[in-house]
């Protein structure tokens, strides 16, 4: 016996069976952001002087470059997950919903590539 009406079965309304994975990834990325954010704040205190030379030296350490890249990618993935939920819940017209989701993915991907490329470029010897 099903609790769904025949009309809802035909329309395909109901669970998409993907909510748990999305919910779980939001929690995992939030936990990773707490850890990476704590590392980033400690690193800012350790740097002390935010001059260009000090920042390049700090970022030239491979561990710092990897952790900062992880921080940027995790932050943007977490943001993408949250914005996806807002779009799915509050944008009604299907064309706007699909367009908004595609635009969100494009912007987040562009920001991630730009951020990681910038970190790698600076860590490989600065901008000179």
What function would you assign to each model-found segment?
Residues 1-128:
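Membrane-embedded alpha-helical bundles that constitute the cytochrome b-like, heme-associated redox core
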């Amino acid at each position: 016996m099903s609790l769904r009406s025949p009309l809802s079965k035909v329309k395909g309304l109901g669970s998409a069976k993907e909510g748990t994975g999305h919910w779980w990834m939001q929690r995992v990325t939030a936990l990773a952001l707490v850890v990476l954010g704590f590392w980033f704040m400690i690193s800012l205190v350790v740097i002390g002087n935010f001059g260009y030379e000090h920042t390049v030296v700090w970022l030239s350490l491979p561990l710092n470059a990897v952790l900062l890249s992880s921080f940027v990618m995790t932050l943007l993935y977490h943001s993408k997950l949250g914005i996806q939920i807002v779009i799915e819940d509050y944008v009604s017209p299907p064309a706007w919903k699909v367009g908004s989701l595609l635009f969100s993915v494009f912007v987040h991907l562009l920001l991630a590539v730009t951020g990681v490329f910038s970190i790698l470029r600076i860590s490989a010897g600065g901008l000179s």
